[in-house]
Swiss-Prot record:
Name of the protein described by the UniProt record: DNA ligase
Domain BRCT: start-end pairs: 591-669
Organism: Synechocystis sp. (strain ATCC 27184 / PCC 6803 / Kazusa)
Keywords: DNA damage, DNA repair, DNA replication, Ligase, Magnesium, Manganese, Metal-binding, NAD, Zinc
EC number: 6.5.1.2
InterPro entries for the chain: BRCT_dom, BRCT_dom_sf, DisA/LigA_HHH, DNA_ligase, DNA_ligase_AS, DNA_ligase_CS, DNAligase_adenylation, DNAligase_N
């Protein structure tokens, strides 16, 4: 594709996306995709300035507003913000404004969380709200005053004794995550399409023709910009403006911070990059503003951006890339998982080349093909996944992907059990299943065998030294010498680590066996109720379902596992090799075990695996107790995702915060 053709394609794609976003409130492109395409357009135009056209998105502020509401011109334009995607680009921004104002040796910065919502402009006359307008294209928006007045965090009357004749306030209307989830649940129950994210939901809500619907959806508003026409000298800094807004009755984000230099800005950004998951609303970066208004006025604006502010964005959690191949992976349970092999991209701070496609149904639903441009997403610690195929960019002559009918590792026919989405290899001798079983057995949360990672497991299998996890305990140093990665010392260390693993507790061994649906938490629950492998192997489905947290699917999987003759032989082999498949000297069904005796816990947030009841059960079974509020008598706060104020109070009191993994380690015998 020639450069002029690529420029034309980029302009058309960005204009279409901009129109859908600003006018229709129906985005067709993720922010990270738009950013990437926009930066490519900027680069190509900088390299080929003769090809710049007046209608290019780089030469415009936005699109025309929709016609459903009355159009209103903004007295002062609502500019976009320039984006920085790393600290280096932030430093370059500072260098640029310093060249414009060389006499300024040092500036203060105000850092504000970049709320993922919808910008609106409010006008007050003599203290009363007279108009609310959407951002629109930055110069003209839509009047939505009736809807604005339903937002409780926006004052209808300013809390000022002698308000100025005119006050203009800008800020972000947004939906808290809890409210967003409630709305989507209601829409799902009514058969309506779901909002893709809280920002889309906020924008769509503001443009509802019926104010009653807006009122029901409980939007909130953070104010961040103040204009006092005719009284500009009254406020001399952004920090002073925020204080004024709070005094006037507006909600200002409580996490704003005044920074003395760029180092403090970077520290603020890094702190919130990790802590933002605790917030009850979405944020995708930090807005950095020069604090001093005189310096802001000296720097002024470009055609699109204020020179005195920039948005420092968090690493993308969604980004586009191209599919190079589709492979399938056979796991330790025989599950066959398709993976997309892609052009390497940066995603959430890491380089990503593979993403899960989950199963055959998902491939068919996406109609993903080799050569497609796709959007991949990464949330938390999970493996990246493909969430959308950009079919508008699909090359010609692509063909649908055909799922394999035979196992790529052993050649056995693949089967799809009834009522399951996962296709499986059911050959118990499959090399891929054995490899996954060995890796799982040695993993940190199971037997924790140091030095026995994937590459070593592959080496052992290729040299036919092991055929089950039991074979690990018969390995000798002499067998390892001469193999790739092994010398005398490394061989001795691995054999010693395998020997040490024999003393791991029953719950870890149970988890390491790899029974379907029996994760770390369920293994802990089962080991407490059935303190020996004999008792567990003899348990019926009703016995297992009687354990708190164990449902019929898990119970059936456990019973079926112990009925398998090969698994019965494995248990016998492990016991003969010296592993103790029982709780050693401790009856963990009794609360006098003392592991947490006398300890007081408070639970907050959503845990990755445990429910609150399960966590409380484990604490009480181990002699501890759970209370509802944090005090000086609290020993631990068990912290999940999106915790409330309890986490902050615990930190202020110096109380230890525990993740779920750290909590489970406390329960280890």
């Amino acid at each position: 594709m020639t450069t002029p053709d690529r420029l034309l394609q980029l302009r058309q794609q960005l204009q279409k996306a901009s129109y859908a976003y600003y006018v229709l409130d129906a985005p067709v492109m993720e922010d990270s995709v738009y950013d990437q395409l926009y930066r490519e357009l900027q680069r190509l135009e900088a390299e080929n300035p003769e090809l710049i056209t007046p209608d290019s998105p780089t030469q415009r502020v936005g699109e025309q507003p929709a016609s459903q509401f009355r159009s209103v011109a903004h007295n002062i334009p609502l500019y976009s913000l320039e984006n920085a995607f790393n600290v280096q680009e932030l430093q370059q921004w500072q260098e640029r404004w310093q060249r414009i104002a060389p006499t300024i040796e040092k500036a203060e910065y105000v850092c504000e969380l970049k709320i993922d919502g919808s910008a609106i402009a409010l006008t007050y006359e003599n203290g009363l709200l007279v108009r609310g307008v959407t951002r629109g294209d930055g110069t003209t928006g839509e009047e939505i005053s009736q809807n604005i007045k339903t937002i409780r965090s926006i004052p209808v009357k300013l809390n000022l004794d002698n308000p100025p004749p005119t006050v203009e306030v800008r800020g972000e209307a947004f939906l808290p995550l809890e409210e967003f989830n409630r709305i989507n649940h209601e829409r799902e129950a009514q058969g309506e399409s779901l909002f893709a994210n809280p920002r889309n939901a906020a924008a769509g809500t503001l443009r509802q023709l019926d104010p009653k619907i807006v009122h029901q959806r409980r939007l909130q508003f953070f104010a961040y910009t103040l204009h006092l026409p005719g009284q500009e000298d009254k406020i001399q800094s952004q920090w002073q403006a925020l204080e004024y807004l709070k005094k006037a009755g507006f909600m200002v984000n409580p996490h704003c911070q005044l920074c003395k230099g760029l180092d403090e800005v970077v520290a603020y950004f890094e702190d919130w990059e990790g802590a933002r998951q605790r917030l009850p609303y979405m944020t995708d970066g930090v807005v950095v503003k020069i604090n001093q208004y005189p310096l802001q006025r000296e720097l002024g604006f470009t055609q699109k951006f204020p020179r005195w502010a920039i948005a420092l964005k968090y690493p993308a959690e969604e980004t586009p890339t191209v599919v190079k191949a589709i492979e399938v992976n056979v796991g330790r349970t025989g599950a066959v998982t398709p993976l997309a092999v892609m052009e390497p991209v940066q995603l959430a701070g890491t380089t990503v080349q593979r993403a899960t496609l989950h199963n055959q149904d998902r491939i068919q639903e996406l109609d993903i093909r080799v050569g497609d441009t796709v959007i991949i997403r990464k949330a938390g610690e999970i493996i990246p996944e493909v969430v959308r195929v950009m079919t508008e960019l699909r090359p010609e002559n692509t063909t649908p992907y055909i799922f394999p009918s035979h196992c790529p590792a052993c050649g056995s026919p693949l089967v799809r059990p009834l009522e399951e989405a996962v296709i499986r290899c059911v050959n118990s001798s499959c090399s891929a299943i054995l490899q996954g079983s060995l890796i799982h057995w040695a993993s940190r949360n199971a037997l924790d065998i140091q030095g026995l990672g994937e590459k070593v497991v592959i080496t052992l299998l290729e040299n036919r030294l092991v055929n089950s996890v039991a074979d690990l305990y018969g390995l000798q140093v002499e067998q390892l010498l001469g193999l790739e990665r092994f010398a005398q010392k490394s061989a001795e260390k691995l054999i010693a680590a395998i020997e040490v693993s024999k003393s791991q507790p029953w719950s870890r061994i149970l988890f390491g066996l790899g029974i379907r649906h029996v994760g770390q938490v369920n293994a802990k629950l089962l080991s407490q109720q059935f303190p020996t492998v004999e008792k567990l192997s003899q348990a019926s489905i009703p016995d297992l379902e009687g354990v708190y947290g164990i449902g019929p699917e898990i119970a059936e999987a456990v019973v079926n596992w112990f009925r398998n003759p090969g698994n019965q032989q494995l248990i016998q082999d492990l016991e003969e090799l010296g592993l103790v498949l029982a709780n050693q000297g401790i009856d963990q069904t009794k609360t006098d075990s003392g592991k947490l005796k006398g300890k007081t816990f408070v639970l907050t947030g959503t845990l990755p695996n445990l429910s609150r009841l399960e966590a409380q059960e484990l604490i009480e079974q181990s002699g501890g107790k759970v209370t509802s509020s944090v005090s000086t008598k609290t020993d631990y706060v068990l912290l999940g995702d999106k915790p409330g104020s309890k986490a902050a109070k615990a930190e202020s009191l110096g109380i230890k915060l525990l993740s779920e993994a750290e909590f489970l380690q406390l329960l280890e015998p």
